[in-house]
From Swiss-Prot:
Disulfide bonds, paired cysteine numbers: none
GO CC annotation terms, alphabetical: cytoplasm; membrane
E.C. designation(s): 2.3.1.129
Single GO molecular function: acyl-[acyl-carrier-protein]-UDP-N-acetylglucosamine O-acyltransferase activity
Family: Belongs to the transferase hexapeptide repeat family. LpxA subfamily.
Class in the EC hierarchy, top level: transferase
Cellular localisation: Cytoplasm
GO biological process: lipid A biosynthetic process
Keywords, sorted A to Z: Acyltransferase, Cytoplasm, Lipid A biosynthesis, Lipid biosynthesis, Lipid metabolism, Repeat, Transferase
Gene (name only): lpxA
Key word tRNA-binding present: no
Primary location class: cytoplasm
Name this protein carries in UniProt: Acyl-[acyl-carrier-protein]--UDP-N-acetylglucosamine O-acyltransferase
InterPro entries, sorted: Acetyltransf_C (IPR029098), Acetyltransf_C_sf (IPR037157), Hexapep (IPR001451), Lipid_A_LpxA (IPR010137), Trimer_LpxA-like_sf (IPR011004)
Length: 270
């Protein structure tokens, strides 16, 4: 049975599933759909064609699904889809997609978006991610699974961040980040690999292989793209080579890499 505060303003066109809790002074618009077990604390605003997945909890003064902050937006149909078991903390803002993008903003499962996180139009966020306080995502950003982004970090539109990456706090990131890398700075560049996340997700032999692969990729000569092509030719059946090198070759913004910033010896630090 759902528990809905008397002061909540809910459109009769909204779809509220069983077991939903809606706190005082929430505002829920026409196209909103809340799956089972969703919990809205007081003063949450949900608008537009917004779907919230099972057991997601949204804290006070978060605003989801309102018109994208894009001057090209002319009221066309677009969506915001949030998966299951997410925690969305106070004052977060998440916009739906636009005609100029994929027409939707997508957030996976089991993510934590801390206070004041901003997710702009057409972003795609995977699962098991943590976005710390004040993280700002511009439009069209893609973030893989198991990514951590430190507080007060700003990320340029169209940037891609692959699985298992760590972005240090107060960074300004304008280029793509391949799998399992750690970046830091303004502008942010790769500083090494995310050992902590790799140990959680991978076997020791695979970690060793990835370290050796990045050491080869980040040689001064040939270029990073040429190195990625060579690795794909020589190790075409290896899933890690495919994942990492294909990501590098697909980059349109370039990779956040400077040879002077990357230490291939950090693996020895245990």
């Amino acid at each position: 049975m759902s528990k809905i505060a008397k002061t909540a303003i809910i459109s009769p066109k909204a779809e509220i599933n069983k077991g939903v809790e809606i706190g005082e002074f929430c505002v829920i618009g026409d196209g909103v759909k809340l799956d089972e077990g969703v919990k809205l604390h007081n003063n949450v605003t949900l608008q537009g064609h917004t779907f919230i997945g099972k057991n997601t909890e949204i804290f006070p003064f978060a605003v989801l699904g309102t018109q994208p902050q894009d001057l090209k937006y002319k009221g066309e149909y677009s969506e915001l889809i949030v998966g299951e078991d997410n925690l969305i903390r106070e004052f977060c803002m998440i916009n739906p997609g636009t005609e100029g993008g994929i027409k939707k903003t997508l957030i996976g499962d089991k993510n934590l978006l801390m206070a004041y996180v901003h997710v702009a139009h057409d972003c795609v966020i995977g699962s098991h991610c943590i976005l710390a306080n004040g993280v700002t995502l511009a439009g069209h950003i893609e973030i893989g699974d198991y990514v951590n982004i430190g507080g007060l970090t700003a990320i340029h539109q169209f940037v891609r961040i692959a699985k298992g990456c760590m972005i240090a706090g107060k960074s300004a990131l304008g280029k793509d980040v391949p799998p399992y890398c750690t970046v830091e700075g303004n502008r942010a560049f790769i500083r090494g690999l995310n050992r902590h996340r790799m140990r959680q997700l991978l076997e020791s032999k695979d970690i060793d292989f990835i370290y050796a692969l990045y050491k080869r990729l980040f040689r001064p000569i040939p270029s990073l793209r040429e190195s990625a092509k060579l690795e794909l030719e020589e190790h075409a059946n290896n899933p890690f080579v495919k994942e990492i090198c294909s990501f590098i070759l697909a980059s349109s913004r370039g990779v956040a890499y400077k040879s002077s910033e990357y230490s291939s010896e950090e693996k020895q630090e245990e």
